[in-house]
């Protein structure tokens, strides 16, 4: 007999399998090719109450205060009672299990203490009170540690839906930017059919692209030949992944739309506008002075990816007539340039401005956006009906299956084909593939 959690995982896998087989049947019948994937994300509200939040910063701050209270309390206890001197060392991390051992030792010592006069009895009562207080601190520390364990890499979660993260939703009736528990739903579409989906706890789209491609590969044992997404996915890590895995990236980057405006003129003082001598590795400032390389700065992203930015320093900036427009810091100007990211941006710009890129950019607006519009406004699917990632995944898998079947029937009806005959063959094929899986 399966436990409830194991049963949820099993059901999620089976429903996901049905969705995958339906998409494969659609590909077999010519509705889609699985060669191109239009990717976008939206936030769907959880069933959890919006006032059940747990914030990482609050937990960490209160936990630090609690540890200070515990150390002060331990210092107040008689040294003859404390057997473990290590707890006085601030470098030792106190844990609930360590506090439980200390409490047990204190109780054992206090049980065998003999009191003869009134003052000794009063002191004994005070020490027992401190032990009870220490027990309360131990339980509170255990609660904070449990919160941090549930949080993982996230900054918040909901008490009634621990898998949900608090995010700012597009549907903000009060217009005050209030956060609500929800999930970042990423979908991939082709010809307005949902071909892949996955839920993420982080609100930003940048960190979801690579895991989402892995989801596609897990479903279909291959990656799409073309990936199309908006500027929210345009990072160095994502561009590099697509290049190394043979995915032709039609992915915008920040300021791409701004660059395409007719009245756009680049700022001549920005690092991107300065002349760069690749052979000798130096920049030329607007006054013609060389900016020589002085080092490299390395940064780690939230996903652990290391980016490298070359640093260049100007010469004789003091007294320069263009200094006020060029920069306002003291000393000589220093710029930082990520050459690898700039190269990826140039490649992306060439693709996006090509004839094929213009076609994909036009289709992206009517691919996932159309699905989200149908889902949220025509079908009123703005909030999940269940709690927990497994059940929520099943929830959307059912929706995606129904959505694809509805879209398929509409296409058949529009094409004037014999709907019943072809639909029967599709469902029979789907049934057989699910049995053989």
Residue ranges and their predicted role:
Residues 7-244, 253-254, 311-312, 321-324, ...:
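Polybasic low-complexity intrinsically disordered regions
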Residues 2, 188-189, 277:
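Hydrophobic alpha-helical segments, especially N-terminal targeting/anchoring helices
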Residues 25, 69, 73-76, 109, ...:
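Residues that form generic nucleotide/phosphate-binding pockets
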Residues 38-43, 230-236, 258-260, 333-340, ...:
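A glycine-rich phosphate-binding loop feature that marks nucleotide/adenosyl-phosphate handling sites
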Residues 47-50, 237, 284, 376, ...:
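Active-site-proximal flexible loops/turns
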Residues 1-6, 10, 437:
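Single conserved hydrophobic/aromatic residue that forms the stacking wall/gate
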Residues 201, 206-207, 319, 358-436:
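Basic, amphipathic alpha-helical segments enriched in Lys/Arg and hydrophobic/aromatic residues
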Residues 78, 243-390, 397:
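Helix-centered, glycine/charged polyanion-binding patches within enzymatic domains
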């Amino acid at each position: 007999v399966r436990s409830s959690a194991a049963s949820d995982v099993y059901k999620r896998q089976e429903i996901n399998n049905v969705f995958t087989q339906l998409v494969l049947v659609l590909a077999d019948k010519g509705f889609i090719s699985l060669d191109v994937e239009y990717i976008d994300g939206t936030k769907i509200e959880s069933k959890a109450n919006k006032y059940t939040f747990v914030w990482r910063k609050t937990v960490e701050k209160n936990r630090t205060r609690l540890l200070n209270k515990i150390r002060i309390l331990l210092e107040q206890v008689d040294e003859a009672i404390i057997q473990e001197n290590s707890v006085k060392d601030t470098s030792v991390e106190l844990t609930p299990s360590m506090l439980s051992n200390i409490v047990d030792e204190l109780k054992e010592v206090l049980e065998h203490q003999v009191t003869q006069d009134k003052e000794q009895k009063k002191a004994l009562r005070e020490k027992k009170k401190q032990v009870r207080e220490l027990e309360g601190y131990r339980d509170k520390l255990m609660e904070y540690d449990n919160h941090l364990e549930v949080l993982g890499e996230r900054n918040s979660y909901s008490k009634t839906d621990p898998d949900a993260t608090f995010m700012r939703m597009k549907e903000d009736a009060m217009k005050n930017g209030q956060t609500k528990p929800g999930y970042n739903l990423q979908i991939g579409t082709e010809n307005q059919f949902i071909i892949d989906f996955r839920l993420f706890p982080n609100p930003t789209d940048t960190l979801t692209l690579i895991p989402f491609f892995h989801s596609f590969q897990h479903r279909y044992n291959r990656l799409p030949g073309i990936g199309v997404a908006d500027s929210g996915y345009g990072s160095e890590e994502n561009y590099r992944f697509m290049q190394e895995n043979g995915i032709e990236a039609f992915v915008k980057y920040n300021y791409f739309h701004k660059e395409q405006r007719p009245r756009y003129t680049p700022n001549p003082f920005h690092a991107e506008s300065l002349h760069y001598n690749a052979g000798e590795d130096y920049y030329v400032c607007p006054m013609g002075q060389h900016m020589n390389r002085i080092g490299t700065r390395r940064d780690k992203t939230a996903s652990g990816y290391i980016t490298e930015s070359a640093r260049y320093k100007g010469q004789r900036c003091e007294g320069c007539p263009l200094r006020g427009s060029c920069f306002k810091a003291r000393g000589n100007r220093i710029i930082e340039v990520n050459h690898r990211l700039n190269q990826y941006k140039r490649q992306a710009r060439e693709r996006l401005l090509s004839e094929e890129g213009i076609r994909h950019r036009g289709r992206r607006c009517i691919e996932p956006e159309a699905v989200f519009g149908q889902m949220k406004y025509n079908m009123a699917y703005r909030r999940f009906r269940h709690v927990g990632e497994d059940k929520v995944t099943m929830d959307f898998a059912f929706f995606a299956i129904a959505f694809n079947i509805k879209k398929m029937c509409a296409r058949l009806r529009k094409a004037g084909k014999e709907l019943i005959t072809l639909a029967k063959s599709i469902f029979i094929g789907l049934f057989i593939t699910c049995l053989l899986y």
